[in-house]
Amino acid sequence: MEKLYNIADTTLKKLTKAGADFGYVMASITEKHEFNADGEKFTLLRTTYNNSLGLCGYKDHKKGTTNINSFDKEAIDKAVADCISFAAEGKEDEAYAIYPKQDNEDFKQGELVPDTDKFFKRVTELVDTINKDYPQVLIYELIASYDKSSSVYMNTNETVYTKESGKYSLVLEFCAKEGETVTSLSGTGFETLDLDTPFIEQAMVKQDIESIVEQLNVKALNGKLEDATVIFTPACMAQMLMFYFGTYIGESSVLEKTSPLYDKLGCEVCDKRITFKSAPKDKRIVCGASFSSEGRAVKDTTYIENGVLKAFPISLYTANKTGFEAPYCNSYIPVVEAGEKSIEDIIKETKNGILVGSYSGGHPAGNGDFSGVAKNSFLIEDGRKVYALSEAMISGNLGDMLNNVVDISKETLEDGSMVMPYIACKKIVVAGK
């Protein structure tokens, strides 16, 4: 950490000497221990180290940024010169700013020393379990890694943050095959600090694998479903909420005043059961953000509480441009409050609808309209899953969807990056051939 501190300190001094009125730097070293598997075989085992140095300088109300992957003196000197040059070519804007001096903090998160033997055993156990218990499932790719990061942040207001974090992660891509029938690829994954629980039992790995086996027998949906209920799995709901985040309350939509909710702060904007936070400090989030590049420690921030819009996830720059208050966290680290019913009961109470595992489509229009393919989906009739669907389409409006919530499950996906329930909605068109 001392090495990173000295690099950050030296770089910041060079940046100010070169003419920056204010700015910040962050020096980081990342360490990755990675296992890859293809089918039953492990194909890669490696450890890599990477350096990163980010610079941001402001001169005459203009901004310049650059990033390099070297700590060599010559590389740093060039990066400083480039940063000042980029600022000189930038557009003048008095809204550029960093936060005043904050209390210096040292952050430590997760496992700073990996148990690689136990981690490898858990990964091997997962591969063996899939091959034994789900013979139809073919592992296309498995990437398991332990990632450690050490960083030092400094700015010209003399705020200094240091951070060390370490976590395990797994990404799994797979399909199912029976005879000549092969499903499309599906995926699952998580970030964790827990090596005591088998990986098949973490996040929704088991549910996702079982779901792909059910996809071996698919049928096309004919026509439209009238007055359908669409139940989004947690992973799919995270997709839809990310679209909502960007279109309705995100940085660019607020800055450009294209947000449909621009004048709705403090107003009810969706179903009262929706409470949506960005929560890097939640204990279920693994190694969440600790501070912003503008020089302030982050805190959990509620954007929507009981359906009421409480804040926009914007930067200090956008806050200065618009007059809205910048929250303590403007990243997408979603934690959505769970409901009271089980997903089993929600399905039982659904007369006509579909369960959607993932969504494939373009980015929604500026007004929130969306249209795309409902992938890994199932038809629901009279309270039960009937069969897997192929080529089903869903279309609607994100705002209307969240204003027509049928129910929210008590079960949640906790994969280290989010906490998300199943959410059932109306006002969505479901169509087949």
Language model features: what each stretch is:
Residues 4-13, 20-32, 77-163, 196-238:
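Acidic low-complexity segments
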Residues 20-53, 141-161, 352-374:
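Structured beta-strand/loop patches that form or line metal/cofactor-binding pockets in enzymes
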Residues 32-88:
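N-terminal alpha-helical targeting/anchoring segments
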Residues 13-15, 42-46, 127-134, 156-164, ...:
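A generic local secondary-structure boundary/capping motif
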Residues 62-63, 171-202, 267-273, 309-331:
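Short, acidic (Asp/Glu-rich) active-site segment that either coordinates a divalent metal cofactor
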Residues 264-433:
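Dual-mode signal for accessory low-complexity, basic/Gly-rich regions
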Residues 46-59, 161-191, 303-305, 374-381:
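Short beta-strand elements
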Residues 250-269:
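Amphipathic alpha-helical
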